[in-house]
A protein has these predicted regions:
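Catalytic-domain carbohydrate-binding cleft regions of carbohydrate-active enzymes
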Residues: 1-157, 287-465
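Catalytic and substrate-binding regions of extracellular carbohydrate-active enzymes
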Residues: 100, 108-114, 118-335, 445-449
Length: 465
């Protein structure tokens, strides 16, 4: 078998002729022919019983970068959900002409070239302080070129729906427009006590200290589902030089990775690992079914190096659905300046479930046990579809995610590539944003962000969806 290398485009005529000649010389009794991967799989299928079978999850280790552009990822997921609804309702024929036009425009969106190659077009070893980055984006053509390319690729999901007939095009565009709904206003006074929401099926207590759900009780069973820091706890994580050294030693020693996967020039700055969580919140009830929360933002003293670009606002909204065991959570991150320093934003969900095999992750329609990852695979970060579910003999917990898709089981697992077992009593942690990976992914981001989640409780015996 002869395949082409990564990012090299189609074979040239000369390379095709050379491939045929060399293969015929090496295998004179064989028939040499071009084939698709599907045709190759069909040829191998009769031999499948004699081949090794791997049933464990591999765990893609190259998915960090997809968290670098929340707007693009959210839009892509929204268009795909809309397409699924059209197919389910009979409004779109799967594999029909309209569907293929739409998918043809969408296919480039998840592909890993989200812009220019950073190892070639972003070799600057400066720009890690916010004022340096601002100046470079204004004055340095290479920085500006990267911005333009990331912006163009970000528009791909929105541009894709333009190939649809007018009714569907307008519907999809309206749904994409809703993704930019701004954060609500919340009174500036700090909440003196926890706030509570309840319906006939569940009761939620929202902490005045963290803004997270500190208690979530299924009123049908009396079970308390929130553990530790609760459900919906926000965190900011900054990474330092030592984090990247450890990651390089563990993951990839190749020389090219310093520029391609790393942060060239970061060692020139006094950057240290940093973890910050809000220490207070303002809250306000909106009717009987919703609470708006404004989280405290950090004082400058948290990072005197001026290497961190904090959001100016972090806003949460909790909404209970009437007569349902569901709680919707929306998180807005507003006014965050662009920052080249490696960083990540998280929303954590610590669930009171003690069955170590109770968790499953929805990955391309399959229910994956996060413990069942092959040795050397990526067990600490997964890309999910609907989200994560937990089941035991006494009930169940669903965490559905509409916009964010990267989940780290058992703790913050970015830049971690060991084979230590997971401790899922430490919950599921949704990565809202990170700029850790290089290649062609955005290295900074200054758009407002919005993330939607749904928590659903189940009585015992209810199946996963």
């Amino acid at each position: 078998m002869r395949v082409h290398g990564d990012n090299l485009g189609p074979h040239s005529v000369a390379s095709v002729r050379h491939a045929y000649a060399s293969l015929r010389a090496k295998f004179p009794q064989a028939t040499v022919a071009a084939a698709t991967l599907s045709q190759m799989a069909a040829e191998v299928e009769p031999l499948s019983q004699s081949l090794p079978l791997v049933t464990q999850e591999i765990g893609d280790t190259w998915i960090y970068g997809t968290g670098a552009d929340p707007a693009k990822t959210s839009a892509l997921r929204e268009v795909l959900r809309t397409r699924t609804e059209w197919v389910d309702s009979g409004r779109l024929e799967p594999g029909g002409a309209q569907d293929l036009r739409l998918l043809g425009e969408l296919i480039p969106a998840p592909e890993h070239n989200w812009g220019l190659s950073t190892s070639v077009y972003l070799r600057s070893r400066t720009g890690y302080r916010t004022e340096e980055l601002d100046r470079s984006r204004r004055e340095d053509p290479t920085f500006a070129a990267n911005d333009l390319e990331w912006d163009a690729k970000r528009r791909r999901p929105r541009d894709a729906v333009l190939v649809l007939p007018r009714p569907q095009r307008e519907e999809a565009t309206a749904r994409l427009d809703e993704l930019s709904t701004p954060a609500p206003s919340v009174p500036a006074t700090l909440a003196g006590a926890d706030h509570h929401l309840a319906n006939e099926m569940m009761r939620a207590s929202i902490s005045a200290d963290t803004g997270a759900i500190s208690a979530l009780v299924d009123l049908r069973t009396g079970r308390q589902w929130a553990l530790g820091s609760g459900l919906g706890a926000f965190s900011y994580q900054g990474f330092g030089v030592e984090d990247y050294r450890r990651y390089a030693q563990r993951y990839n020693h190749a020389a090219f990775t310093a520029n391609d996967f790393g942060k060239p020039g970061l060692d020139r700055y006094p950057v240290e690992p940093l973890l910050w969580r809000p220490g207070g919140a303002s809250m306000a009830h909106v009717g009987q079914d919703a609470v708006h929360v404004e989280l405290e933002t950090p004082p400058p003293a948290v990072d005197p190096t001026r290497l961190t670009a904090w959001p100016t606002r972090i806003t949460l909204r909790y909404t209970l659905a009437p007569d349902q065991a569901t709680n919707d959570l929306t998180c807005w991150v507003t006014g965050k300046a662009a920052n080249r320093r490696p960083e990540a934003l998280w929303l954590s969900f610590l669930v009171a479930g003690q069955d170590r095999n109770g968790w499953r992750l929805d990955k391309v329609g399959e229910q994956i046990n996060p413990h069942d990852v092959i040795d050397g695979g990526g067990r600490y970060l997964h890309g999910v579809g609907r989200g994560a579910t937990y089941r035991d003999a006494e009930g169940g917990f669903d965490l559905e995610t509409l916009d964010a898709h990267l989940v780290s089981p058992g703790g913050f697992g970015l830049l971690r590539f060991d084979d230590e077992p997971l401790d899922l009593t430490e919950g599921m942690h949704m990565n809202l944003y990170n700029n850790l990976w290089g290649t062609a992914f955005p290295q900074w981001y200054d758009l407002d962000m919005r993330f939607r989640f749904r928590v659903r409780l189940h009585e015992s015996g209810e199946a996963r969806r």
